[in-house]
Amino acid sequence: MSSSTDDAGTTTHSLQEFKLFETQSNFYMIGWDGSGVYRVLKIDRLDPSELNISQDSTHYTKKECYELLKRIHEGNKATGGLKLVTLCYGIIGFVKFLGPYYMLLITERRHIGDLFGHSVYAVSKSEIVALHNSTVQCNFANSRDENRYKRLLCMVDLTKDFFFSYSYNVMRSYQKNVCNYETGHNLYEKMFVWNEFLTRGIRHHLRNTLWTVALVYGFFKQASLSESGKDFKITLIARRSRHNAGTRYLKRGVNRNGDVANDVETEQIVSEDVPEDHPMQISSVVQNRGSIPLFWSQETSRLNLKPDIVLSKKEPNYEATRLHFDNLVERYGNPIIILNLIKTKERRPRESILREEFVNAIDFINKDLPEENRLRFLHWDLHKHFRSKTKNVLALLCKVATCALMLTDLFYYQVTPAMTIEDSMSLSSSSDADTGDISPHTSSDDDNGDHDSLEKKSSRSKNIAYGKCDVKPPRLQSGVLRTNCIDCLDRTNVAQYAYGWAALGQQLHVLGIRDVPAIELDDPLAISLMGLYERMGDTLAHQYGGSAAHNKVFSERRGQWRAATQSQEFLRTLQRYYNNAYMDADKQDAINIFLGTFQPEQGMPAIWELRSNSLSNGRNGEMNIGKDERFLVKRCLSDGDFLHESCTPLSAMSSNHESMPQKGFSAPLQHVSHILSESSSDIPVSNDVALSRCTPSMPRKQLFGDVQKVHRFGSDQVYFGGEEDMSSVSNFVDIEWLSSENPCENALFDRSSELTRNLTAETSSTENSVNGVGQSAPTISESGSSSSKGKEPMGTKIREDFPDSFKEWVAYGEALCH
């Protein structure tokens, strides 16, 4: 995004500041890039139902631009002349409902960080400007439906969790930016650019992206830390997919294209903290979360906090599920590692229904894949393990994370002083640059095919750059860990923190900041990282579930008073329930309007008229929706801070907003004390969660050694362990070792150190590396001291006629709703 090719074939730096002027017949936007070059964009106002945009190919100086504006003013004096409308920082896009077009602008921005010398911004204020003027008649400009559509658009609060950069491709991971650099319009077609639809018209007209910004929705946070006197910066980025996006109970599972709800890519970048933010060594690692890729749903209920889960469609060949995993391979390469955290056994089957079908789907898909490309999985009932008072779940999750890291590796890149970071971003072929040729029917969405070229481009780059600048070859991440629970919020966030914790030690080790790739759980670095992941979890939960995440584990680690934690969890359960039951329908409509999933047409039903129709005719991608077809609202998952309930973020809109339903919910609250909310955390708090004083490691026996084959759900599943414990099933990690009580062996990290020492050597087969560890690495046990003892009952005698859940709450002080 640092440059774009205009219609004259000239490469121009990104425009970053703009002024919008108006006459009675046209808008004129003046943009400049900070280097003294000014450009002019003209937008016609006489036919507001059509988007007529033209760009002046002339590159003006400041003086020439001033003279041009003066001439325009003189020529329009009879109709009021040229007037300044606003200063702005980029065009978000254009949208049309039933009447005229509207232009969305960023009028205020705030700096939130830097990536390798490139500034990253968030939106502080936005404005919507109607293209028509008061003298032009527009039949639908002030109609009731038109105003309601504008109010829906205004519900999208662009000041919450949207971010962008003029010169760095924040919608792509650092590895993709280095190994397959892209510019221009292709970037807007990625799955993480939320204003792709809104910018489609102007990009098609101008065949460049000089005037627009690509908005990413999710989370961005940086922290500067120090270890042994060495400063480094950690950046945590979450990118939410625009595909199958929506609110929690209205978007669940997978659609027919293989897109899952709540699909979020999380990237953890660690780099040297140096002046001017030009680090010489950088490491990044990517993980993924997403809804279970099956056709399933849950009805929103105002009387039931725990609605039933329904498998709405069973595919004999699991085509949509297969498409989803094919897409993950195209995005990240092999192997795909699935960490499935949902429940195994329930009094009334809910999550377990999906677990069984998910196991079937993975097994069916694996039968058609070569052994080296099969899906790796760990079905691990996190709720059950958290309820066990003898297990340190974070340490166990770190074991899983370390095994996954050994299979996928991480990305490491070194730049010498002879090579700038901009040079490193251009290692791939120049043919990837934007040519300016845009076809409305072509798409490079989702970075499909990018990973196939990583090795080839990296190899070519060695010959081009490494020989001249003495740059060490990079380490490449190939594959990804995909984590899910039911909502992919609370349990998933704990698991993602464990993965980030394991990765951070290895990233600091490969950067030479730490001598060993192991970080204890009570290390200040782990605590700082926990704060970042907790904040990310809250943000993503607000976007998807309507409340902050259930963070009982993190609260316990901070030493928060248990009663305060219980109250906090209870209030978050109520907040999530209320938003899901009463607010999500309008929020879903707002998302669909913003993303272009629904496009209003005159004479056709409005989006709010289709809600009941959608409930009776289709759910979760079962309805056939072509690219040019109108949309029928679907039920599924996601919510967000991104939706502004007061409907004011687009400040130019002054219409009176319709009030949201304000029905009381006293009746449902009567059931809260005995109905467990599926939205609440399924993670009981236990002090032993905080007791990891040592780092996980490799088992004594070979990781892929002799395993027991168990016939399960009609197919052969790899099962580790002596008993048929259905809470834990895996084909890539030894469950018996995972649950063992001696998690302090060092072989895993010994192997990691060996990989670091051999950084410049060619990367060997990932699976062979793992097998080699199991065969050769001895295990050494350490005694890990604990900062506190395991949790004990309070000693209160409880009557036997009370329910088990109540007795457990009295004995262990846990929340009734969990």
Swiss-Prot record:
Residue ranges, compositional bias (Basic and acidic residues): 789-800
Residue ranges of every copy of the SAC domain listed in the record: 153-546
Molecular function as annotated in GO: phosphatidylinositol-3,5-bisphosphate 5-phosphatase activity
Residue segments, region Disordered: 426-459, 759-800
GO cellular component: vacuolar membrane
Membrane topology: Peripheral membrane protein
Annotated EC: 3.1.3.-
GO biological process: phosphatidylinositol dephosphorylation
Cited function: The PI(3,5)P2 regulatory complex regulates both the synthesis and turnover of phosphatidylinositol 3,5-bisphosphate (PtdIns(3,5)P2).
Subunit structure, as described in the record: Component of the PI(3,5)P2 regulatory complex at least composed of ATG18, SAC/FIG4, FAB1 and VAC14.
Extent of Polar residues compositional bias: 759-780
Motif Phosphatase catalytic core, chain ranges: 482-493
Gene: SAC3
Organ and tissue specificity: Ubiquitous with a higher level of expression in young seedlings than in other tissues.
Organism the protein comes from: Arabidopsis thaliana
Coiled-coil annotated residue ranges, if any: none
Annotated keywords: Hydrolase, Membrane, Vacuole
Pfam family, one: Syja_N
Catalysed reaction equations from the record: a 1,2-diacyl-sn-glycero-3-phospho-(1D-myo-inositol-3,5-bisphosphate) + H2O = a 1,2-diacyl-sn-glycero-3-phospho-(1D-myo-inositol-3-phosphate) + phosphate
Enzyme's top EC category: hydrolase
InterPro entries registered for this protein in UniProt: Fig4-like (IPR043573), SAC_dom (IPR002013)
Comment text on domains: The phosphatase catalytic core motif (or RXNCXDCLDRTN motif) from the SAC domain is found in metal-independent protein phosphatases and inositol polyphosphate phosphatases.
Cofactor(s) needed by this chain: Mg(2+)
Domain of life according to the entry: Eukaryota
Principal cellular location given in the protein's record: membrane
Protein name: Phosphoinositide phosphatase SAC3
Subcellular location: Vacuole membrane
